[in-house]
Amino acid sequence: MSADASRSDGPTGNGHAAVDEEPRPATYYHLARAVLYREYLIFVRYPANAIGGIVVSLFFFAALFLGGQLLAGQALTDSIEGIVVGYFLWTLSVGAYSSVSNDIGSEVQWGTLERHITTPFGFAPVALLKGIAKVVRTFLTSAVILALMLVITGTQLSLAPLTVVVVAGLSITSVLGLGFAAGGVTVLYKQIGNWLNLLQFGFVALISAPVFDLPWTRVLPLAHGSAMLQRVMVDGVRLWEFPLVDLALLVAVAVGYLIGGYLVFEYATARARRLGVLGDY
């Protein structure tokens, strides 16, 4: 009797244990933690590549600064603070843009794009969180570049962390939307890397857009945010000192372009599925 009872209890107990040990469904918290940890591992395991990116950015800035001094002399010295701030925002913008567009392009080339489609989260949320994780890393590397630029030029800027992070973060959110749109086009047409890289140089025109002379340019990506970041880092204006209209416009432009880029991405991937070219390369 006791042996039979013990035998009958064994499977039942194991059944309860199996039920208790069933894996819990992953949440967006787990996804965000995973992609952040992935970026950390990439930085730690391939530090030469990360350091190389910083060196290349500093090389271009040094060429711009020294060449400008030879050509413009004192005129460049008088406006060097604005150039430093603009270059800082440009490095952030390129990082935010390429974080989505180049990453999706790489997934297409490697043939690993389909694994994002099969996740329970969906393709677009995974790409968005991976882009945000790369933006966090870009902020850290751009901060190092900014510090070295200040040392090279001998200039001083107002660096209120909260204001700089909020204004710069909202400014490049619109570029993240452009990256989404470019990533969707990459999924659909595959080899368009040259066109995507060309758009990065257009960020220079957006950052230097004359928003005071041409008010309509404020609705373009980066333009309004660049003007606000100049006031923050050069004039020392704090976040709560800006007019509510300026802050509302900054948020509206950021959210508008992010949603627009997200919708383009969704449309392009859906069309690629219909055409049967999602995994083709």
Model feature map: region roles:
Residues 1-281:
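Hydrophobic transmembrane alpha-helices and immediately adjacent juxtamembrane helices
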